[in-house]
Amino acid sequence: MIVSVPLINGKYSAISMIAVRKHEEGVYNIIWGFYDIIIDDISQLDELVKNTPEIFCTPFMICGMTYHDLETGRWKVIATLNMNLTNVDLDDESLRKQHYDVIRPGIPLLEMYLGIRPWNEFYDPEYLDKILLKGFSKPERAWYK
């Protein structure tokens, strides 16, 4: 499932629901994929999904995150895709421990990657560096406060 995410600068991005994993008894963790997407108008997301669905095969980050904003309607479902992730093996135990057994503040991290928030917004200025997936690094647009 691809959903639109409003950003603090008035633009939009998209994230994908990759999986639902049992975290502990009665508690489930939604695994989300994050992408290098920033657009002005939500209608552009429809075109992006239709014309370049392969963009959703290589997230720069995955993490566990709640779905409250989806339930409240803040995030809109754009499409349902059968995604074959090319850079993530959801059965990899080390990825599970590092990336999706942990609930993270995903949208602020997305905004840091997109250059909307400062890269060093958290206490650990290298926090985001440590959780980017293999093959991804700090983008040139990153800035510091």
Regions found by a protein language model. Give the residues of each.
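Intrinsically disordered, low-complexity coil segments
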Residues: 6, 22-27
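Residue-level signal for short segments within beta-strands and strand-turn junctions
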Residues: 7, 19, 34-36
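Short beta-strand-centered aromatic/proline hotspots
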Residues: 11-21
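Short solvent-exposed strand/turn elements
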Residues: 25-51
